[in-house]
Amino acid sequence: MKTPHSIEAFLPNAQSSIQRSRLRKKLLAWYGLHRRDLPWRANRDPYRVWLSEIMLQQTRVAAVIEHYREFLRRFPTVEKLAAAREASVLAAWSGLGYYRRARMMHAAAKIIVRAHGGNLPQSEAGLRGLPGIGRYTAAAIASIAYEEPVAVVDGNVERVLQRVLGKRLAGEGLWVAANELLDTNCPGDFNQAVMELGAVICTPRAPQCLTCPVVEMCATRGELAGTVKAPAQEKREIHYALHCRNGDDEVFLVQRALDAPLMAGMWELPELPSPCGAEIPAFSLRHSITITDYTVRVVRAATPAEAPGKWISVGKLHKLALTGLARKIFRKAVIL
């Protein structure tokens, strides 16, 4: 029986199970030959899969690679993560942004150790009971680490499905279509293949249709660009003070409130009024957070303004939960 969102209902080129089987084989063969060599693909350990999926949420692959390796060096197992102090976890996460992900992962690790003997639940349903693990993340972990036959839907999968099927799907319709197309014999690889196709071939702009492994089965040849338009970037200018003493061996930092809506408890440089009077910035840099592009002006000064803060040894900065912007400023100033 055809459901309203079934593949047979809207894909003339894949009406038969034979056509769907061809699509799966072509996509898996392409993935086997052309997939990117990413560190989390070398090991299907559930903890590592979980870590990579959380880090990849709203974060570029290039940025995740460096942090993934360092995080595993500090917390190689779920037990090590559960036993760590939150400040240490946030310090290891510094630079990735969206720190709620780190806090939720830390909380989930404690539950896994306490209630599951240190082993992640082996089903999508069980994984969704943990903090910070939603439908997509649970399906990704379950299919990649445990080969549970469940499909994933993220932005890349949505775009591929809409173009291949020639239909603007949304909500549950996407999940139904993804699960019907899923290769249940190797769901982990198939899910990663669809996401990889969306990331490197079936891109939002200028899709590489000539090199697409399933182009002959695609209903649109890349013409359907998607349903969500990226919001326009807001532009802002902000100013920070870089206070140093003892030959630049110590820097002055302030801590965000523990109940702050963003980056709670993280350490950063004191912000200055904009514009900051007659002070001439020592240097400037660019920084982006979600839909805002910042031009950051940094002023060097010998003594801090009257602000609740703390002098921190430069040698201890790598252990501190710094905001991504603070870390970027220190690198620009050749302090980190």
PLM region spans:
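Catalytic cores of DNA base-excision repair glycosylases
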Residues: 10, 18-21, 26-210, 214-217, ...
